[in-house]
Amino acid sequence: MAIDSRGYSRYVDQFVTTEMQPPERHEVHGNAWERNHRVRDAVLKRAAGQCEYCNSPGFKTLDGRIYLETHHVIPLSKSGADHIKNVAALCPNHHREAHHGEQSKAIRDELLKMLEKKQQR
């Protein structure tokens, strides 16, 4: 595993930790934004099985469906709408990059342009 000058792994996932101990189990309470399943369904239909950022096909799931992830371009937590004008279907790589990547702002800007064009059709 590649280690940087601070002693951290160069590679991370959503569960990254600097400690090498087994995780402890604990109960978590919180709030979640309610999402409209009709928006998700319409966005996935619009994408027709292709990432709306890179146009690559989603992968096939065990039950034969095409997998993409729906992404709120302007997050709900930042007053973004749960509407097809603000939601894109992305491959898992670009969905994670849109949240955690160095290019997240560029991806957001490109997705906003793409969604605007699709609304004009």
Model-inferred region functions:
Residues P57-V87, R108:
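Histidine-centered nuclease catalytic patch
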Residues M1-A2:
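Short helix-coil boundary/hinge micro-motifs
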Residues C54-K60, N93-E97:
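Cys/His-rich metal-chelating microdomains
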Residues Q50, V87-L90:
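Short pre-active-site segment immediately N-terminal to redox-active cysteine/selenocysteine motifs
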Residues G7-P57, A81, L112-R121:
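Short, charged surface segments at domain edges that flank catalytic/cofactor-binding sites
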Residues V43, H72, C91, H95:
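Divalent metal-coordination and catalytic microenvironments
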Residues L76-K78, N93-E97, M114-K117:
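Glycine-rich loops and low-complexity Gly/Arg-rich segments
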Residues A89-A106:
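Short Cys/His-centered divalent metal-binding micro-motifs
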